């Protein structure tokens, strides 16, 4: 580290010597004497005296006044010294003041003046300047040069002790123009002090320009499953969907049991006689049974009247004679007496209904009959909302019992058990929603009644049916849906019910 510092000192001295040589070679005219001016008061003082006003007590002033002699072209300097001392025992210096308007004040900086000094005249102390340049011409502000490239970082050096700000201002002078090089080179090693304390936080700057949108980041890791949120509000009723296609046709069922023989049909009309067939050869058969009596033949002619017989005694009646031939009709005789009533003829056609006769006398009251036993059997069940859309092919679980006092409805099997044979009335009213419906009333596994309702979407419809059926004791009746058509629905506002009751019982044997 000492070798680097020594190398820096030698390099600086060599540069100073070269610059001084060039400056002395190029300067051929003598610097003119400046006009006589008074040194302005420092730190708000009112005179050129020492140490007055707000100036620190350790600083003094030295005022130099120059007067021109008429007998000589050269001026004679008369110096009035006011001792200027400070903590570092600096020697008194000669200073010459210039008018405040000699140069533009736009090149002055507040960092060159002591605290409290205004934008007035500034004095440059030449005793601390080893390199003299021409200050005859007023400086002109040249164009700003291009920024230079940043040099490589230096090796660094040990930091020298800091110089107090008052001493540094005194060593450099308070009237320093920014365009001159009259700064002591030997003080360059003392400009860098120790690192000071951190200053107060400055005011926040203006917000910067919005940067470009960054690239999309990588997909982050999957977070943990959050807690279940509160149930949302019920949404509005959606639009009605398009009608769906009809369900696929089910497979053909197994062959059912052979049913009982139906009643005989009516006798058909007699067909026409066929053509006479050829006479076939047939051996003589056995003698058949006696046929039925034929129809009576036509009456024969009336016989002639025989001679009158002798009046004899009553003899035995003779045999019945042969029926004589029908005689020719005789002339109209005289009306004879009324003969005896003949045999009863064939019944004639039914005559017209005669007028209603008078009401007869009321008969006596009959004896009291036996008390007939009243037979009852009925049920009525519904569907809870939780059992909506039941599985097809099975009895619908009607678990909401509305009436079942005779307990002929089995809630476990969802079937009605017939106890009293007779004629029953069955009806069902089914609410249909969201899905189509195909329901069937089943008796002992045989579908007796079917209902269809093709409905899709959020609309609600009702499917119902009613029938009279004769049941025998032990028969079972239930309601079931078919495949893909199980749109049975129930809610707090809509019900699906199944009802049955005995209309009249069969008479007991």
Swiss-Prot record:
Domain remarks: The C1q domain mediates calcium-binding.
Q: What is this protein called?
A: Otolin-1
Looking at the record's lineage, which domain of life comes first?
Eukaryota
Where in the sequence does glycosylation occur per the annotation?
A: 121, 246, 311, 417
Ranges for the Collagen-like domain? 193-244, 285-329
- Residue stretches of biased makeup (Polar residues): 62-75
Family indicated by similarity: Belongs to the OTOL1 family.
Q: Name one GO molecular function term.
A: calcium ion binding
Q: Explain the purpose of this protein.
A: Collagen-like protein, which provides an organic scaffold for otoliths onto the sensory epithelium of the inner ear. Acts as a scaffold for biomineralization by sequestering calcium.
| Cited SUPFAM superfamilies | TNF-like (SSF49842)
Quaternary state and partners of this protein? Homooligomer; disulfide-linked; probably forms homotrimers. Interacts with otomp.
Look up the signal peptide feature and give its range: 1-25
Cell location: Secreted, Extracellular space, Extracellular matrix
Q: Which organism is it from?
A: Oncorhynchus mykiss (Rainbow trout)
Which PROSITE patterns does the UniProt record give?
C1Q (PS50871)
